[in-house]
């Protein structure tokens, strides 16, 4: 099977980290500090949203994630994005996902609130399995 992992960012609050732990999938965390991370395999990106709500989308994508995605090698391996947020912030709920999806031209696969629910965990596990299978099929497709 093709290798596929979760790459995620979680602040010191660890909300996203706790969600990723529930998935039980191979994962790498984008460091909170300025240490670089480079991945050399396909991945799904899980990212929280840092927007204030209303029409203020500034800062929705964490700076660490921007820094990570500024590396062309990291960008090319991203197969999709999943974002979290807080519905109390209205229109900016989980906005980091659509922003990254548009910039990288990858699918926005799911959005969840705060720590996510058991249903969110199952959905993301299913998305991961489907994408891993699809990635495997593409890599093993005979050339004509």
From Swiss-Prot:
Full protein name: Protein NrdI
Pfam families associated with the record: Flavodoxin_NdrI
Gene3D superfamilies: 3.40.50.360
BP terms from Gene Ontology: protein modification process
InterPro entries the record matches: Flavoprotein-like_sf, RNR_Ib_NrdI_bac, RNR_NrdI
GO molecular function: FMN binding
Listed SUPFAM superfamilies: Flavoproteins (SSF52218)
Family: Belongs to the NrdI family.
Domain of life: Bacteria
Signal peptide limits: none
Role of this protein: Probably involved in ribonucleotide reductase function.
NCBIfam families hit by this protein: nrdI
């Amino acid at each position: 099977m093709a290798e596929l992992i979760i790459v995620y960012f979680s602040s010191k609050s660890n909300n996203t980290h706790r969600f990723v732990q529930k998935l039980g999938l191979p994962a790498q965390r984008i460091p909170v500090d300025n240490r670089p991370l480079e991945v050399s395999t396909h991945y799904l990106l899980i990212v929280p949203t840092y927007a204030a709500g209303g029409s203020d989308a500034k800062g929705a994508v964490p700076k660490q994630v921007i820094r990570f995605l500024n590396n062309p090698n990291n960008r090319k391996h991203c197969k999709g994005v999943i974002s979290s947020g807080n519905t109390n912030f209205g229109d900016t709920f989980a906005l980091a996902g659509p922003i990254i999806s548009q910039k990288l031209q990858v699918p926005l696969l799911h959005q969840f609130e705060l720590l996510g629910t058991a249903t969110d965990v199952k959905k993301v596990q299913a998305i991961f399995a489907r994408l891993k299978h699809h990635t495997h099929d593409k890599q093993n497709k005979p050339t004509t």
